Design a protein with these regions (language model features):
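Catalytic phosphate/nucleotide-handling subdomain of diverse soluble enzymes
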Residues: 414, 418-456, 462
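Thiamine diphosphate
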Residues: 116, 452-545
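Hydrophobic, well-ordered secondary-structure elements that form the walls
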Residues: 298, 370, 382, 421, ...
Length: 567
């Protein structure tokens, strides 16, 4: 039934059509009409007031990653809108469905350098899948509906809708509609490519499977697990592919690439077939393109044809939705057996275990303890740096949408906002953000968001008083010249958190951490744990920049090299 509504009412009606129940944002002058309507309909759509618009964009991203639904954030014109840019770029790089709604000055004020006027459509063009500016009330509803459809279809991504203030107040006829059904973009998967892939898989003696974030975005975890059993192959993943395949499964060998396990890096280098599923072959994964998987033929399965042969030359590509492609392959492939190869991989895992210093508090030790105390069931978000790699290496993820991190853009300050979004979307899960002390400083104000909105996230600060990952590179490749990476100062994170209304404790031993973490979970309140570790702790293994992944080295290898050089 048609009814006369103003633009702000239409925005809310369109959000409800799409099943939106939570919005993250920060108000301002240009968007006041929409916020007035949010107030009137607060029983239908919950608005989380963040401490900064960037926090809102990360929260929408975290909500989307944790739930599989579209995350929604809002901001006013000018600096409010530009503060969303880093979060939109983060979502864009990782193909996360987010819809950002911003308001702009009235149509008559556009192009006149008006107060808080900005061409946010132009600004966000490189970091959104699509964007709009709505200057006509008659186009508002269709634009918002289309934005949601674009964000979710094909290769997912963020979409921005900028609405002039006069449109939010204007009135027109509105008729509610059912949301459009999202169909895979590539409905016809090429038979020739499928046949080639099947022939290559059935001819392989030493196949390896590489899983990326596209498997999660396609909700293809079940099909992936069936496929791996069907072809009897070892499995590695990218940072974005965590949880698609269970971390406790014997076939799983860990992450591939710069900080991947030696087993994955050496195993892929010795394979005769690499099946890359839903991954874009980031430089952090392949290392040296010329030597990457040089013995192997490569099959790439991806929804986006632009990713084929972009970084790594492949032999066969199947373009299509990962879930749809694997469903076909699982139906048509015969059962494979690779006992000798699988045993070789198990021997490799025994030869190259992941180790760390257990006599003191350390990043890996913290992650393993969190895994133990949460029984592997928590949602883990991270910032970016050493702690991010430790969280990827030492928490054994059993399901998709359990590990939320900024993979492509590498955004420091992402994790706390993402944790807030994830907890809003999955209130029954324990949500833990793993942060470094450098990252915590970026968006620490979102602790106030958690306390104000009573969102019980746990913030674990892995505090080594340095910018750990940058310092690691300075130590290994820049002659130990530690330029601007030392953070020894008088900032007290515990007092900061307490000042914002959260509970907090500082811990210096694993025993102290265990007791404090249990208390944090039991409190069901925002809680910060300041965990003091050694400044010299490093992420191992490591591949030197530009090096071959087969040359991954660890601390022992480095010591042997130093001893040989000193002879």
């Amino acid at each position: 039934m048609k009814q006369v509504l103003n633009g702000s009412e239409i925005v809310l009606e369109c959000l409800k059509e799409q099943g939106v129940d939570t919005v993250f944002g920060y108000p301002g002058g240009a968007i006041l009409n929409i916020y007035d309507e949010l107030y009137k309909q607060s029983d239908k759509i919950h608005h989380v007031l963040t401490s900064h618009e960037q926090g809102a964009s990360h929260a929408a991203d975290g909500y989307a990653r944790a739930t599989g639904k579209v995350g929604v954030c809002m901001a006013t014109s000018g600096p409010g809108a530009t503060n969303l840019v880093t979060g939109l770029a983060t979502a864009y790089m990782d193909s996360i469905p987010v819809v950002a709604i911003t308001a702009n000055v009235g149509v008559s004020l556009l192009g006149k350098d008006s107060f808080q006027e900005i061409d946010i459509k132009g600004v966000t063009m490189p970091v959104t899948k699509h964007n709009y500016i709505v200057k006509d009330i008659e186009k508002l509803a269709d634009t918002i509906r289309e934005a949601f459809q674009i964000a979710q279809s094909g290769r997912k991504g963020p979409v921005l809708v900028d609405i002039t203030k006069d449109v939010t107040a204007a009135k027109t006829y509105f008729e509610s509609m059912e949301p459009a059904v999202i169909h895979p973009v590539c409905e016809t998967i090429k038979e020739k490519s499928v046949k080639e892939a099947i022939e290559m898989i059935e001819a392989a003696k030493q196949p390896y499977v590489l899983l990326g974030g596209g498997c999660t975005l396609s909700d293809a975890s079940e099909q992936v697990r069936e496929f791996v059993k069907k072809i009897d192959a070892p499995v590695c993943d990218t940072l974005m592919g965590k949880g698609v395949f269970p971390g406790e499964d014997p076939a799983y060998t860990g992450m591939l690439g710069m900080h991947g396990t030696k087993t994955s890096n050496i195993g892929v280098s010795q394979s005769d077939l690499l099946i890359a599923i839903g991954t874009r072959f980031s430089d952090r994964v392949y290392g040296n393109a010329k030597t990457f998987a040089s013995r192997a033929k490569i099959i790439q399965i991806d929804i986006d044809p632009a990713e084929v042969n972009k970084n790594i030359l492949i032999d066969t590509a199947i373009i299509g939705d990962v879930k749809a492609v694997l469903t076909i392959l699982n139906r048509r492939l015969s059962q494979q057996q690779h006992e000798a190869w699988m045993q070789e991989i198990q021997d490799m895992k025994a030869k190259y275990p992941m180790t760390y210093h257990q006599e003191r508090l350390s990043g890996p030790g913290l992650i393993e303890k969190i895994y133990e105390l949460t029984e592997g069931d928590a949602i883990i978000t991270t910032e970016v740096g050493q702690h991010q790699m430790w969280a990827a290496q030492y928490y054994k993820y059993e399901r998709p949408r359990q590990f939320l991190t900024s993979g492509g853009l590498g955004t420091m300050g992402y994790g706390l906002g993402a944790a807030i979004g994830a907890k809003c979307g999955c209130p029954d899960k324990v949500v833990v953000n793993i942060a470094g002390d450098g990252c915590f400083r970026m968006n620490m104000n979102e602790i106030a968001t958690a306390t104000r909105s009573e969102i019980p996230v746990i913030e674990v600060v892995v505090n080594n008083h340095v910018l750990g990952m940058v310092r690691q590179w300075q130590n290994l490749f820049y002659g130990e010249r530690y330029s601007s990476t030392t953070l020894y100062d008088k900032v007290d994170f515990v007092k900061l958190a307490e000042a914002m209304g959260a509970k907090a404790k500082r811990v210096e031993t694993i025993k102290e951490f265990e007791a404090a973490f249990k208390e944090a979970v039991a409190s069901n309140e925002p809680y910060l744990l300041d965990c003091i570790i050694d400044s010299d702790d490093k992420v191992w293994p490591m591949v030197a920049p530009g090096g071959s992944i087969s040359d991954a080295f660890n601390e022992e290898d480095l010591e042997k090299q130093k001893q040989e050089e000193s002879k």
